[in-house]
Amino acid sequence: MEFPDHSRHLLQCLSEQRHQGFLCDCTVLVGDAQFRAHRAVLASCSMYFHLFYKDQLDKRDIVHLNSDIVTAPAFALLLEFMYEGKLQFKDLPIEDVLAAASYLHMYDIVKVCKKKLKEKATTEADSTKKEEDASSCSDKVESLSDGSSHMAGDLPSDEDEGEDEKLNILPSKRDLAAEPGNMWMRLPSDSAGIPQAGGEAEPHATAAGKTVASPCSSTESLSQRSVTSVRDSADVDCVLDLSVKSSLSGVENLNSSYFSSQDVLRSNLVQVKVEKEASCDESDVGTNDYDMEHSTVKESVSTNNRVQYEPAHLAPLREDSVLRELEREDKASDDEMMTPESERVQVEGGMESSLLPYVSNILSPAGQIFMCPLCNKVFPSPHILQIHLSTHFREQDGLRSKPAADVNVPTCSLCGKTFSCMYTLKRHERTHSGEKPYTCTQCGKSFQYSHNLSRHAVVHTREKPHACKWCERRFTQSGDLYRHIRKFHCELVNSLSVKSEALSLPAVRDWTLEDSSQELWK
């Protein structure tokens, strides 16, 4: 005959006895909190208490739990579960219950806590995703409404379409020869603010392919392009007018047109310089006007802080033009003879003084240059500078790694292995000779190294310095302790290795094995 309610009645009686303190034969201390309980119940529900009472039952009346891992409310909850068979989290954090259950080897509670944490993480992730979707939808609606209103306000009228095309696109034969397939452009907002030169407006309005012969007119058009390109560089991010799109079928985007305008500007600078030398025999008035215009163009190119960067294929063109200018100025100014070495030094010094401010403006968006402190090379970004510096450090490390020929390095005569000092060499030579200089005074056993003798001496003193932190069993050697942990506490180690990253919860503690400063029992 079976009594189904017997187990429930037994637990109820034990719970009443615990509350009354009747026949309680142990006290569990968690920090400052004390819990009276029965050893039989604790050992039946927790593998920790089972191993704790297994060896010396009579000397274990008080049990100290690590308060850094097990909190008093969490242990009270688990104690109620042991006596009543019910687990009620109430307002207690699930993480604390998980830590206490893992410490006490209550694996059923550990599974329940992990399941609840996963459900909590899933619900939080779903709610966060819904909020992000709602916010992204609202942002898209706002951006669409703003974009439609902006485009409606920027649309030009059909009557002014032809005039805008004439004002915004200024092609010439010289530009097409410098960069075929690309044309220089200007935004509609700048057409009204910059007046055209007198010698330039009429030829472009009547015939687009007509070339200008005089240096003054060419420099005027070049200066006008430089001013317009400066204003375009400040407004790179703005949208082109729709009226210009019909004439820009060969241009892919604004950046390519911006680069082509810079190419045309560089080529015009070189050609204008040649024209200046060809027309040096003309009247002084034309020469003075040209010099004034050309100095303006050079100033706008070299000291313009709005130019952000330059394509890599323009660097050789600019360097060649600067070198030609420097050579011509040197030949015109220096009448006395110079050696080849002094000529090369002067040209290199001129290049550095002229290129350094220009590179400082175009290589870095913030107007910065990154120079190597060892070789004075200039780089466009700090990342490339770090890669370059690593080559210097590798060279220095290579020089350090090669010892000098006259330095005596401790080397083993049998196997050729090198060592940092003579002490390590002598220790290594014992592996070849079999020498064992350290002898135990009690049993006469010899050892090669002193630490092996110290480990052996514990056998004679019967000292057990290695203790298990879960069941407090003590061992003479550390290897015996490791084997004991693998045999009896392997599941605990695996359960405590679960980290907060696996659960995707930043609030979950990292339950790794840590050294406890308090003893578990006295």
From Swiss-Prot:
Chain intervals with Basic and acidic residues compositional bias: 121-143
Q: Which domain of life is it from?
A: Eukaryota
Q: Which Pfam families match?
A: BTB, zf-C2H2, zf-C2H2_4
Point out the coiled-coil segments of this chain.
Answer: none
**Subcellular location, record wording:** Nucleus
Biological role: Transcriptional repressor that plays a role in various developmental processes such as myogenesis and brain development. Specifically binds the consensus DNA sequence 5'-[AC]ACATCTG[GT][AC]-3' which contains the E box core, and acts by recruiting chromatin remodeling multiprotein complexes. Plays a key role in myogenesis by directly repressing the expression of ID2 and ID3, 2 inhibitors of skeletal myogenesis. Also involved in controlling cell division of progenitor cells and regulating the survival of postmitotic cortical neurons.
Q: What is this protein called?
A: Zinc finger and BTB domain-containing protein 18
Task: Give the source lineage, highest ranks first.
Answer: Eukaryota, Metazoa, Chordata, Craniata, Vertebrata
Gene coding for it: ZBTB18
